[in-house]
Amino acid sequence: MNDNAFITVDRVTFGYDASRTILNDVSLVFPRGKVTAIMGGSGCGKTTLLRLIGGMYRANQGTITFDGRLVDPRDKAGLFALRRRLGMLFQFGALFTDLTVFDNVAFPLREHTNLPEVMIRDVVLMKLNAVGLRGAAQLRISQVSGGMARRIALARAIALDPDLLMYDEPFAGLDPISMGVTANLIRKLNDATGATSLVVSHDVQEGFLIGDSASLLSSQGRVVAHGTPAELQASEHPEVRQFIDGAPDGPVRFHYPSRSLEEDLGLVQ
């Protein structure tokens, strides 16, 4: 047993239906207080893994434990308590467009606590200050840029001082400056709060830069490699090398599994 384990994924298999398995016998341990980059090609199950950890889905097989407690979507009270300790930055922000920046960040505080509004105000301003956007508190979401929206979502994710922060493609669609700012915030917030962070990303450079360790999932939803960034960079595993080097040819095929083109066009008798 790993005493430093905060999240344990034990032989988890999951598919949205019987026709396709997304995650296949996945076992991973995410240590307390560390940043782990979860990488792999599109469709390999990275986001699905975060959703399973957050209790949004239930695994077909295997178990997930959060700080020693089983994650089970059927346990509504337990799930509510788990989400009180969890912050998630979704790929597309998931901000409420009809609310101000301030009210977006205040939302989890109003939902999960009984704090008076005067205290909520102070907490929200501190969180916005941490991401450099205290001055934007009264703006509408329609008035902010994509990079600012990502930082607002981050401020909301840390509003409850969560023990676990999960980031789903936090660098997607950002310019180089915004990407650097976001990566720096993720690393600094983790170090300052002692939280455990899971970062799903296609960006090898940023993932290796901020991650204490990294996990690589294959196109078949299996764990190909797990270790420090240096260990993955030194790996000779064909799928690891193809992903890190961005090579077009390798174990990961360009075409989604299908019948032959000749069969689909009716050319085969």
Where are these regions (language model features)?
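The feature captures the beta-strand-to-loop junction immediately N-terminal to the Walker
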Residues: 39-41
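Helix-to-loop junction immediately C-terminal to a conserved catalytic motif
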Residues: 54
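Conserved ABC ATPase "signature" region
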Residues: 69-70, 117-136
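ABC ATPase NBD coupling module
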Residues: 71-87, 117, 232-235
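Conserved ABC ATPase signature
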Residues: 140-144, 148
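Conserved catalytic motifs of ABC-family nucleotide-binding domains
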Residues: 161
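Catalytic Walker B motif of ABC-type/P-loop ATPase nucleotide-binding domains
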Residues: 165-168
